[in-house]
């Protein structure tokens, strides 16, 4: 028998949790207007679908899909209000802003799928064109146009407003902009109305209604039923062309990419951070788009051992917070320690190598195989990149001395420094050995025996 829990907390189902969150959003006064428009949208969509069936017009069906898209935009607006109410949780430490992006991406993709469905149905109608009844065609056009414009202009939809401005222009906007420039050249007073970038949703609503009006007139005058199919194809292409740039932009945000227009600003800020007092190196910087208009990022900063961590952290955060809203900065102190070398004479028993005093040569990587550790150059006073961030000897294997005694630091040799470029041509150089002398397996400049022998007498 299993353990009996008398006071077990009841587990809510998925729909129970969804209903609880919906009640949380519905309690806000700002969402009442959206819920009212959503109810009217469902009612209008039902009437439009019935009129599409009675008129047998596929062009009106394609235009009705824009009303369904308005319903998705209202749902996205509700999700935006819900995101503002919720705080980050341990599971979702960055918050729920990405749900807005996901809602916009799903809405635009569904609109494009509806446009593809209209194109498929229109291709079938070209083979056998049915008769179109114009009784409710014009009425349905004006009902759908009025509701779409009223919804777009009355509800402040923050996610779609941002995407429509940030995404690239559609081909419909470009053609209308060209016509507007030509018209404003003739009538300059219209420049304040037509020259600014038009709202793509309002533009497609007006263009679709214009196509349906032409369809109604041609069918009433000449019984030219094929124009209904042509109008449906035109509305579907305009819908696809309008939604495609928005879906591409929101998809890039979901893929956690960096917007191209802020890459130059981020590079400038990184260079400014690398010149701050106490900062030796900036590495592993990574920035991505968290939501619409918000960036997140992380960066590793290596500082001097005598630098104040809190002061450097405050300066770095102050520089980057102008662009990056959610920033993680990790501070590392410099771990490069040079041994203190004395300039006195060498003691007679400083080193006691074995009889053969063989030092195995370390394995060195080729210059081509080395990869840069950081994207920002280190300062001249900083240590080499092999000793960065507690990874000493990343590219060079350590040298093992085959004697049992501990090597003292007071060698009494002249302190020199061999640049990294000479390591591959002259052999490995150690700190404390002259700059022009490296250690090789044969040791041509070192006597074969030195120190004291086993009897305590100096060796020759």
From Swiss-Prot:
- Single GO BP term: zinc ion transport
Q: Which residues lie on this side of the membrane: Cytoplasmic?
A: 1-33, 86-98, 156-200, 245-460
Residues on the Extracellular side?
55-64, 120-134, 222-223
* Membrane topology, from the record: Multi-pass membrane protein
Pfam families tied to this protein: Cation_efflux
| Cell compartment(s), UniProt | Golgi apparatus, trans-Golgi network membrane
Q: Which Gene Ontology molecular-function terms are recorded? A: zinc ion transmembrane transporter activity
Keywords associated with the record: Golgi apparatus, Ion transport, Membrane, Transmembrane, Transmembrane helix, Transport, Zinc, Zinc transport
Signal peptide coordinates: none
Region described as Disordered: 371-390
The source's domain of life comes to: Eukaryota
| Membrane-crossing residue ranges in chain numbering | 34-54, 65-85, 99-119, 135-155, 201-221, 224-244
GO CC annotation = cytosol; mitochondrion; trans-Golgi network membrane
**Which tissues is this chain's protein expressed in?**
Expressed in brain and liver, and to a lower extent also in lung. Highly expressed in brain (at protein level).
**Is-annotated flag, keyword Nucleotide-binding?**
no
Q: Could you describe the subunit structure of this protein? A: Heterodimer with SLC30A5; form a functional zinc ion transmembrane transporter.
Q: Known PANTHER family for this protein?
A: ZINC TRANSPORTER 6
Entry similarity comment: Belongs to the cation diffusion facilitator (CDF) transporter (TC 2.A.4) family. SLC30A subfamily.
Q: Which purpose does this protein serve, as stated in its record?
A: Has probably no intrinsic transporter activity but together with SLC30A5 forms a functional zinc ion:proton antiporter heterodimer, mediating zinc entry into the lumen of organelles along the secretory pathway. As part of that zinc ion:proton antiporter, contributes to zinc ion homeostasis within the early secretory pathway and regulates the activation and folding of enzymes like alkaline phosphatases and enzymes involved in phosphatidylinositol glycan anchor biosynthesis.
Q: What is this protein called?
A: Zinc transporter 6
Q: Which organism is it from?
A: Mus musculus
Q: Coding gene?
A: Slc30a6
